[in-house]
Amino acid sequence: MIKEFTINVSEEHISNINNKIKNYPWSSIEDMNGWTHGTNKKYLRELCEYWVSDFEWKKHEKLINSFSNFKTNVDGIEIHFIKEIGSGKNPKPLLLMHGWPGSIVEFLEIIKPLTHPEDFGGNPNEAFTVIVPSLPGFGFSGAPITPFGPRKIAEIMNKLMTENLNYKNYVAQGGDLGATIANWLGYYHASNCKAIHINCLTMRHPDGPQTEEEKAWLNKFNNDQILQDGYRTQQATKPQSLSYAMIDSPVGVAAWILEKMYEWSDLKNNDLESVYSKDVLLANIMVYVLTNTFNTASWIYYGRREEGGRYFPKDFTKIEIPTGIAMFPKEMSAWPPESYIKKIFNVKQITKMNEGGHFPALEKPKYLIEDIKKFFKNN
């Protein structure tokens, strides 16, 4: 059964969050000057002051509710999703999937251009019917009893599309762990998922790199991860311990998420707001804070580790369905040589962007929209 859903956060809940922010003991935190050691105290405090004085969650709630929101049960988990029916004669079902620390907020500005391109100077016959789920454990979706990872989530997403929404065939797009889920859809659910578009490489071939160029890429990746891997290790091994602190600290959640937005984005002059407004940053953070899902959202890393981590199974052959790839220069980790990519995917399109980072739907929405449209027009 599919039920209509409307977000309606109480003013009391918002007020309680604001009080926690107001009472945060800033004097107990050292100012380390900059972002080298983690989230910048000066900027975080500035953002938090805006949070309690000027940020209006209800404005963002209204935007989300302006789309058609639903909930449905898949494998015992209540899944929240946006579904916007596209224009034209036969709009292709497109599953858009966020990762961590993202949410449905990432996609709010690209839904209309994809579903109603004629309103943006495009062709209505190139429209998609767009489905944007909150992943299990994230936001307004329910959580599993115990952690599971992207491979299981792919199974749930495929059931959402085929059993609950009755689409025999569909296509999928994702970045971050949304790309991981898309990979599993393309490998295990190719009878339904007919093509995927990704903007992040998150999975590895079990045979590893073979050429010198591929080996150099992996060596650079491993070196880069020395200062990047702390959050992932914590969330993949002991997520519960971190959650006790985060569940009662909106400031803590903001700090944890902001660091990644800063590190993984294509900033001008190291200015976070050269790419994102305070409102966009806080709307995404509030999805975690309002729903108390920082804990269960982090479980995806634990589940991923249990599923085998970055590597496909040893019997992996290739994802045979058509794959489109958008490469943004400030992605969290560099893309490997094309020789390695083509061992994993049946690559039909690679677009090398000249700007943008890990969150292209927020950073460079027009680039992502055009690349999605171009790829799925023929795949």
What role is predicted for each listed range?
Residues 1, 10-15, 20-21, 25, ...:
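Alpha/beta-hydrolase
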Residues 235-379:
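C-terminal subdomain of alpha/beta-hydrolase-fold enzymes, centered on the catalytic histidine
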Residues 100-112:
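The serine-hydrolase catalytic nucleophile loop
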Residues 147-164:
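Alpha/beta-hydrolase active-site loop
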Residues 113, 117-120, 164-216:
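Conserved hydrolase catalytic core segment
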Residues 59, 120-122, 135-148, 183, ...:
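Glycine-rich "HGGG/HGxG" loop immediately N-terminal to the catalytic nucleophile
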Residues 13-86, 90, 289-292, 296-311:
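Non-catalytic accessory segments flanking enzyme active sites
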Residues 91-99:
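Short beta-strand element of the alpha/beta-hydrolase
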